[in-house]
Amino acid sequence: MTSIQERGTSAHLHSLKEGEASDRSSEMLPKQRSIIGSHVQRPPSQTTLGRSRAGSNTMNKVSGLDIARRPSENLLSNMNCSDNGNGGNMLNSFVNSALPPPKVNPAQTRRERPASNSSIGTKTTEVFSSTSASSSLGDTSDEGEGSDADKSKINTFPSILMEKATQGRGADGNGMRSASNNTIVEATTDGSKMALQKSMSFDDTAAEKTMNKSRHSYQEQFSSKKSQSSLLNSKQRSRAKSQTCSSTGYNNSSILKTFGISSKISNSSDRIEASSLEFNVPSQKPLNCKPLTPSQKYRLRKEQSEMNLRNTIKRKEKFYDSQEQILELQEGDVDDSLIWNVPMASLSTNSFLASAKPDDMNNLAGKNDLSEYTGGLVNDNSEISYTKQNHRYSNISFASTTSNASLLDFNEMPTSPIPGLNKVTDFQFIQDTTKSLASVYLHSSNRLSRSKLSERTKSSDFLPIELKEAQNQGMEDLILVSENKLDVVSHSRPSWLPPKDRQEKKLHERQINKSMSVASLDQLGKNKDREEKLIRDETNRQKYVLLLDRDITRNSSLQSLSKMVWDTPFSDETRSTIYSEILQSKTRFITKNYIQPFHELQELLTKMGDFPKNKEIEISQLIETSLRRKVSGLHDICPDLMLLLKIKSISSQGIVTGDELLFHHFLVSESFQNLGLNEIWNIVNLVQMTCFNDLCKEKFDAKVLERKGVVAGYLSQNEEFKDEFNTECINSTTWWNILERIDHKLFMWIMDIIVVNNSQSYKNSPINEDEFVNKDWEYYRSKKVVINYKILISFALNVLLNYHFGFTDLRSLCNVNDQRFCIPVFINDEFVDADTVNAVFIKKWAHYYKKF
């Protein structure tokens, strides 16, 4: 598709040549002379005025036609002003006749640009493959009326002449040339005719040569050999054409000098050729020898700038993700791009074998072909960084650094045989030499590794503690790590999570420091309390011994004892003695008068022979449900327990609630193991008759559910206790269900507290044995036994309020199948001290006991 101007030009030239061929030159000559006279002949004084008028008339004419102004208007005005001779008149008349004004389309209503053969939507992509270096060569065609006349001639005039020459070659060679020569001789001078024809031939040759060179230079990036051959062929063809034109006797330089554009055309063509060869892209002018439109030039420059930017980035990049060949996923079916991972280095010492200076590494990288890839690995500030923090940034191998040549001890190599003198083959000689060199390298590298390891050991004292933790987790030895890697590695986040940014790391470090400070203060407080408790326990144990020596049944001694027992349980050496003295005084009055002797009952059991099977089954079932299925079953059960329970079953009191627990824990306790079964029998019966007698149980059942009592005040405030605040769930029998879930150590401490709170001062009110002669147990109990049900109620209240989880009520507590379930909850943790947990339980119990 050709433009309006080109179609008019070609049509006019075609009609002109047909007229010349049919011998109608006489009719066309007067018309051409009239056109030449009307356009060219004007006084020299009116040159400037005529130029401005021509420009204004042209703008008015083009504006009225709704067509953009073309650079040819400036060309006509400049040529009219510069040429006043006959040759100039002939040229102006020819150009004006060859370039008529474009026709106006009456139906055109919008201001649209005329269609051209080189429109914006080009069909080829060769136009947009040039770089920005060649895009500036054709920018002179975009200049306005303020541009120089020479630039207008360079940009516009050769294209017109080239079109003329192209159409002239399309006709018959000899006939058309002779007819054209005859017509032009009659109308113009010989000099003007020679200038016109030589200009046409020169522009054709120069344009074709430039076009061929640009095309072949663009093809050089695909095949160098093919490009060179094509370039030689194009140069030979262009040289042949130039020789053909010069053989006709025409002088190319004379006509170019006539218009003043000889040097500029040659310089522009040279610049086009140089830029095309440098960037391996075609020139700005397309292959059809048509000038580009301004929009195409803009798109060309834009595309070239983008290509230059991409090439620059490509040269400066060190690594591309596309170059990484992933054969298979290393972590299952999950893509590596979906997982952040801090690089994990090996435990080898190869990372610090490189010790070259930055200057040596830069020189070595400049000699290497892969300098663009490895150049980025060298840090220019590594020497400064090394002096400050003793860190390494280099990853160049040990064998490739010239500075490490002195580290290789070649004296270790054995003497090699001389070829020709020794009977050694070349293969054996090379093999031995290779082994020797390898051994030298290995020994030298090991020696260097040891030296570097010693440096790491010396510098490890100045680094944070978290680096040692990272080393223990399997990461690289981070003793000589850089600051950048230290910022990424965080001991508060796993390595498979994304690294923290600076703000997040500061926030987390602040929170961690705060939490650690609070935890450290708590731990310091706990350690201090533990140390104080150890000192206090040891002091209280010594006081127990002193109280026994001073008479523990004194009123002052009992007051001190009641205070100390909440802090420290009785020792194994003093427990049995304290139990006996504070419950029945030193006279052991209850044991002598109201407890059946153990040896008599044992003899009775022996005389019975076979023990009743039903009773034996009941005792076995009692042991199974109360001990073996509970926390007590975690420890061995003494075989004497069955004997004691059988003896208790044939006694006058019989087996009461809690006998199996008391016998079991007293048998296991070191306080009573060495005393024998007789002493254990007496202690268990003494505790049952004084602390858990029938009167105490009756008062417990009556007071625990009292509406104005302490228990009702706590439990009635919470609706969750409305279903268990009754006699079926809370009574003296279900109270023992709590003791079934108590650990042995805490059980003995609880017994110590209960015994102490049921004691009385026998020193101030001693037992008068004559008063209780022939008196039953109820009479003695009413006179000398303290009934303290409050200590039992406070114990149950503590469990209901603070440890009521894992069971519905006290009645269902015995049905919990978990053997390890205990009160307080069993915590199998080395950082949790069982004594501390028990102390907290006792402290809460003391708090509720003070409420009664």
UniProtKB/Swiss-Prot annotation:
Keywords: Cell wall biogenesis/degradation, Cytoplasm, Golgi apparatus, Phosphoprotein, Protein transport, Transport. This is Protein SBE22. GO terms for cellular component: cytoplasm; Golgi apparatus. It is found in: Cytoplasm; Golgi apparatus. Pfam families: SBE2_C (PF17076), SBE2_M (PF22874), SBE2_N (PF22876). Coiled coil: none annotated. The keyword Zinc does not apply. Residues 1-158, 206-248 are annotated as: Disordered. Its main location: cytoplasm. Residues 43-61, 74-96 have a biased composition (Polar residues). The modification Phosphoserine is found at residues 72, 201, 459, 517, 520. With SBE2, is involved in cell wall integrity and polarity processes like bud growth, through the transport of CHS3 and UTR2 to sites of growth. It comes from the Eukaryota. Belongs to the SBE2 family. It comes from Saccharomyces cerevisiae (strain ATCC 204508 / S288c). GO terms for biological process: fungal-type cell wall organization; protein transport. Residues 124-139, 224-235 have a biased composition (Low complexity). The gene is SBE22. Residues 15-26 have a biased composition (Basic and acidic residues).
